[in-house]
Amino acid sequence: MSGLTLGGGSGRVRPTQAAAAFPTSHDFADPDRSSVARNANRPSRRFAAPPQLSDDFSLESPTDSAQVHDNLLQDALFPEWKANSPRGVDSPDEMQKKDPLATQIWKLYSRTKAQLPNQERMENLTWRMMALSLRRQERERAQQQARASSQKSPVPGMSGIAQLRLSDRVSNTPTTTADTVSDAMNLDDFIIPFSPSDHPSPSTTKASEATTGAIPIKARRDQSASEATPVPASFPHPAQDQRRESEFGYVPRRVRKTSIDERQFFNLQIPSRKRPAESSPHVPPVSTSMLAHDPDFSHAVPEYTLDTSHGLSLQNQMNAQQLANAQNHTSPNMAFALDTFNLGDDPILPSAGPYQQQFTFSPSESPMTSGNPFANLYAQTPIASSLNSTDFFSPPPSGYQSTASTPQPAYDGEHSKYFDMPVDARSQRRVVPAYITQRSSNLSASLQPRYMYNQGGSSQDITQQNAHMGAQSSSMQSPGFSIPQHVDPTQVLNPNEFNGNHAAMFSFGADSDVEDDDGNQFSAGGLAMPAEFGDDSISDMNSNMAWETSYPNSFQSLPAFAAQHRKHVTIGSADMMDTPSEWNQGGSLGRTHESAASVSEVRNRDQDPRRQKIARTSSTPNTAQLLRQSMQNQSSHTSPNTPPESGLNSAAPSRPASPGGTKNGEQNGPTTCTNCFTQTTPLWRRNPEGQPLCNACGLFLKLHGVVRPLSLKTDVIKKRNRNSANSLAVGSSRVSKKSARKNSVQQVTPTAPTSSRAQSNTTSESPPAMPGSSGRGSGVVPIAAAPPKSSSAATTSPGTNNGCGAVQVAPKRQRRLEKASDVDMAESPSSTSSGGRSKVVPLAPAMPPAAVNPANHSIAAGQGASQEWEWLTMSL
């Protein structure tokens, strides 16, 4: 378009004689061109065209085209191009003086845009050309005016500031006028600039001019740059107390959504939530991060002190914080009156402090990685899904915000320290101050310190502390699996259960059933474990143990270790059956909060032999240990029909183990249904409280949700015909059921615990012979807690076969095995009741049920799996 010329320049199309006689192809663009031959004296109006296109316009047209298209383009189609319409100036110089070239080009385009081949592209190009030329002219005009104003000397009587403001006002006035009073064709604000390097955008120009016009004011030296510009929390800058010292402290600062809003906690003593979950973590967000911003907040909290690791008092708290800021927070403050045992200054343990300067990981680095210094503080398992942003705090006195922004749970009121050592550790129960509702932690995986101290002080100190601390919250959870939380925090533990002292400072967990009782073997070394405490102190201390890391089916990142003996039996993966000292504590815990184990683990709690790691026999060292535990449990339980109250340790189930049948050494009465009081049922079940139910009552409760009425009770249990052998022995089996019901009320004479222990050692080899064993080998066996070896086990020695005198107690309904040995018994025409009674031979004398003597489960676990389906069908 730069080659276009207007008027009578050199670029004018000069038609030949033939073109003058006949209209050419471009003559139709102007209605005046159609009468060129007739009105030769009229000046012809031709629009500009590039020189290279001038030859194309001189092409001749047919002679008759002038007559055919003479009246085609009339004035009605183009009213603005009438003969009397004003025409432009022929000279390009005169037109450029009056109007810029770009404006003239736009006017030319607006007239001829209907005939252009690429209308939209040409429109865009002409607009850009016009905008560039107009902007360039305005800039040159402004520079000339600025030069002219700067050459004028200021008034000699004016001061320097007045002269500066006058020069700024004069220099800014033309630019402002050029920006505000713009041409009507200047739509540059809505157009992308053609060349960004040619001219700046109007917004940039205005902003730069506005800043240069003001007088620069020096900022205060103590005013940090982070106050002017918002800095993310992950940016490494020391935390400073700017809210009180800055002069704009009344302006509320902007709080990130991912951080704790302290203002909400300042106004409300208890942080408000929309709807906390039933067992969600409730950690009050009171930490040193809030105290750094507002140290006066500690006065609003009762029973709250600010003892630092250097022994600074509460009066020197302000000076201590300023000192910590000056020292780049290498000596942090310790809140909640933690007994740190002066380990912060221990030269042997350089990383004894809770927040170290050497921690060099960022929020983008996962805490589960093994390369950072926090690798030993976290379990190598994924984070649980029940984490809320308000449950964590970021401790600022760690030097930089990048190291403090990784969330950690606030263990309020806990005597805890962190160590950067490869040590597997167990935690004691946390004591939370009573100024806030008791809130427990549900961090099942990653954010748990792996190295914690025991509760300091004697039991009297703990009792006094509980007087103002309120009830204790639930204990920490294992990093390998989930453990339920206590719903009622006011009935968690009795205060006299806390017997830990400084002598037993490290309350690491005791051995379980997968470890040998070989004293104190410490996994990683580095700290000697005290081994000179007695059995009573260990049992009392370990009764409050929070979680174990040596379960058979749990996967830990660090190896477990063994300490003194503990009074509990580890079962399966996540369930723990403690002594009645834990069970007899007051408390109400519903079944829904019982355990986080799966349904199959609850169902097969400890009778399923497949859940055991090894077959428990008398040759394994675990058998003697379990028998010793069973002796302790026997002396504590009153009867198997009185189940314990809710297990107050979070690792303990809220019910005892599944009820077992008769085993060697039964000392208590038979299992009785708590609803219909029957003792003959093919399958024992449990209600939500853990009490035994018969199969009928349990199924009725499970299906209908209500207790089975006693009107539905019947003495007849219909049995399905599974095979032909069963149908042959129906009569004798019913007689044996009746005799079992009649005789099951009797009690066997109790034997000494030593005798039951001696008998328990022999059960895995072969059951001993009993008086009343049938010499015919009738294969009638009771439903034992674990599957017996074979039906011929009862024939090891002959016995008397006369009458009912030798019949032993059968606490459960006896099931007749359908084997070939039953056929000869059914050959007799009549099965008398006495004969039926004589066939009912239990496998062994009575033993305590599974809830009382857990050793019998593991002992009998290796005897085969002939009746394994009985315990696989345990439900509810």
UniProtKB/Swiss-Prot annotation:
Compositional bias ranges of the Polar residues kind: 198-211, 399-408, 455-480, 615-640, 724-734, 742-766
| Bias (Low complexity) | 782-798, 828-855
Where are zinc fingers of the kind GATA-type found along the chain?
673-697
**Region Disordered, residue ranges:** 1-65, 137-159, 192-248, 393-413, 451-498, 573-672, 724-856
> PROSITE patterns, per this entry?
GATA_ZN_FINGER_1 (PS00344), GATA_ZN_FINGER_2 (PS50114)
What positions does the DNA-binding region cover? 721-742
Which terms does the UniProt entry file under GO BP? Answer: chromatin remodeling; negative regulation of transcription by RNA polymerase II; nitrate assimilation; positive regulation of transcription by RNA polymerase II; regulation of amide catabolic process; regulation of arginine metabolic process; regulation of gene expression; regulation of nitrogen utilization
Subunit organization? Interacts with nmrA.
Function, as annotated, reads: Transcription activator that binds the consensus DNA element 5'-CGATAG-3' and mediates nitrogen metabolite repression. Activates the transcription of uapA.
Q: What is this protein called?
A: Nitrogen regulatory protein areA
**Gene field:** areA
